[in-house]
Amino acid sequence: MARLVAVVKYSDEDYPFEKRQMPLYIDDSLTMVLEFSDNMLNLDKQQIDTVQLEQFIQRHRMLKEQDLASAMTVTSREVFNALSQLLPCVGCRRCVERLFSQVMQTGIQALDPLSVGANGVLTLSHGFMTDATKLYTLFYMCGSKMNNELDAIAKNKKGKKNNRCKFHSLDVRKPKPVGGHWMDVWEVMSPECRDEVALIDSNCLLETLENYLQKHRFCADCKNKVHRAFNILTGELDFSKVKGYCANVYQGLRCCPHEGHIHLCCETDFIAHVLGRAEPEFAGGYERRERHAKTIDVAQEEVLTCLGIHLYERLHRIWLKLRAEVQTRQMLFYLGVDALRKSFEVTVEKVRGISRMDQYFKDILEEEKVQELKQEKKRQKKNRKKNKSSCDLPTPLETKSANPSQKNEPPGFMESDGNPCNISEDSNMCAEVTVKNEDLLRSHKVKKGLTPHSNVSDCGYSSSLEGSEPGSQEGSDVACAEGICKHDEAGDDKEEEEGDSCVECWNNCTKDNIKGKNKKKKKKCKPFKCENENTLKQVPYNTESSDSVHSNPNEETKVYNFCMDSEFPRRPWIYHRNEFFSDMSSTESQTRFYSGRETKSLKELLDESECSSQEEDEITQDDIQAFKETYQTFYRDRQQFRQCLKENFKQFCLHQNPSLLVGNTGAIN
C-alpha cells in the first residue's frame, strides 16, 4: 500500500525523491510525497511454481548479456499502443501519459525497478536483469496480479455509455456522507502530513463560511454574530470583550494571527469529532432548529461546523488524488512489465531459431502440401484412366500380316507424293483424330490383324507411308453401307473373301473361315478409281436401308476417291471429307442399324473423335509447368532435337522403301 511520507515545501523545488517515491499534487498550497512499498516482489516460495521457474531459468541462460540488455529495452510507442487497447477510461490514459512524461523529464525512480530514460526508452535495472528468480517473479507473479487489477478497473465503470472509471468521473468529486474514506487516508499519512492537513488557512475557511451562510439564508443579525465568532477564532477579536463567549467550543483549536493559520489537534478522536459535526450537512439533513445565531455560543458552533466541512472536503480531495495516482502508477508499471516480458520472449524465440507461431504455421503449410499432393495424384490417375480408355481398344486377335514391312510402319497421316492428297510436314495441316473404344463402330469384335493404331484399316482413307496407294475398304462403314464391300458374295468367290471387309460384315464370318484366313497372306488393297478430270465426281448415295444394300449383292456401285488431279493444289484430307459428306443427300439419316444395333456414320464418328480429343487429351497448365521444370534445356536445344528427328526419319524411310524417299524429299525437309 502506498503511503504519504512527507510534504514538499515551495522552497524545496529540488526535493530528493528516493526509490519508488513521487510527488502527489493535492492543490496549489499542498504537495505531498507518495511512496510505494516493494513487498510485491517479496513472495513466498510456496506461491512460485518450481517447474515453470526452472524452465524460465533455462531460457534466461540462453541469452547473452548483450541480448538480455537488448531484450530489456522497449520504446514509449510500444507502451502507449498497449495503453490504448487495455484502458477504456480517457482519464486513466491521460494520467498514464502524464506520469510517463513526468518520470522521463524529472528522472525520478517512481517505477523502480523500471526506469525511463531521457529519450523515452523503458528499461529494467541491472540487478533484476541478471537475477532469473526476481525476473520470473516480476514477469509472471506481479504481472498476473496487476492484470486482475486492470480487469477490475475496466469493470468499475459508472455506466454502459460512460467509459470513465470511478476515480475520473464527475460524481466522485462531490463530497459524500462521512464514512471510512477519511480514516483510510488518515492512517496512511505520516505525522508531518497530518500536521499539514490539520493546518487550516483562514481565508479558505472564511470562503467556506460564506457559502454556508448563503446556503442556509441566515439573517443579517445572525451573520454578524457568526462573523464575530470567526474573528475570535482567528485572533482578530479579543474573546474577553465578547459577552456570551464559550471557551469549550474552541477547545483543541489554536490560531496563528500573524500567519493567518488555524491549527487543529492531530488526534484521531478530535478529528472524528470535528468531522462528525459536518456529517448531517453531507447526509442531506440537519437538526430541527432555528437557523439563527442569536447568541455567540451558537455562532461558535456554526463556525465549528464550517471547519468540519472544510476539513472533510480536504481529506476527501486527498483520498481521491491518492487513489487515482496509485492506480495510474500501477497501470504504467504493469504496461512496462508486460512490454518487457513480450520483448524477452521474442528475443528467446529468435535465439532458438524459430518461434512457436512460425512452427505452427509451418505445420499447417506441410499439411496443406500433403493434401495438395494427394489431390494431384488423384487427378493424374484420373487423367491416365481417361487417356487409356480413349486410346486403347479391346485386345485384338493377332494374325500374320501379308506385308512384313508394314509391321514397323509408324502410325500417322503422312502420304507419299503419288497421292494428290499428300500433306507435307511444313504445311502443319495434318489432323489427328482420336476415337473412343466404345464409339468405334459400336462393335465388340475386331478383325484379326487390326491394331488400334494400324494404318491398314483406314476406313476408306489412306494414312500410311504408301500414300500413293488408295485406301482399303476394311472397317469402312461407308463402304459397307453403300454396298461396296460385297460381303454377300464371299461364298461364291473365295478369293474375294480373302480380301478386306468391314468389321460388321466380318462378324458374320464363321470360325473356320477365320482360321483359313490366318494361314493366307493378306492381299493388297485395290486402289480407287481417280478420274483425271478438272472437276470432282460425286458419289451416288444409295437412299435404301442397310438391309436392302446387302440384299442386292450383284448391284455394281462405283465409289470414287475424293482426290484431285495434279493440276489442282493440294488440300488436307479433312477438306475432301467435308466435300464428300456435303454432296450426300440430307434426307437420308446418317444412323444405320446392323444386326439390331445402332451405329453412327463415319462423319459423326470423326466429329465426335475431334471433340473428344479436344476435351479429354487437353494438356493442363500444371502438366506444362511440370514439363518446363523437368526439361529446362528442351527449348534451348529444340532446333537440335528437330534436326535429329528429321535425320532419323530419313533413315527410317530409306530403310523401309528407298524409292519412296526420292519422291518425298521435299516433304521431309
Swiss-Prot record:
Q: Where is this region: Disordered?
A: 375-421, 452-475
* Predominant cellular place of this UniProt entry's protein: cytoplasm
Q: Where in the cell is it found?
A: Cytoplasm
Q: Where is the composition biased (Basic residues)?
A: 376-388
Tell me the keywords, alphabetical order: Cytoplasm, Developmental protein, Differentiation, Spermatogenesis
Q: What residue spans carry the Polar residues bias annotation?
A: 398-408
Which InterPro entries does this one have?
GGNBP2 (IPR026073)
| GO CC annotation | cytoplasm
Top-rank taxon of the source lineage equals: Eukaryota
Gene Ontology process terms (BP): cell differentiation; spermatogenesis
Question: What is this protein for, i.e. what is its function?
Answer: May be involved in spermatogenesis.
The protein's name in its UniProt record: Gametogenetin-binding protein 2
Organism lineage string = Eukaryota, Metazoa, Chordata, Craniata, Vertebrata
The record's gene field reads ggnbp2
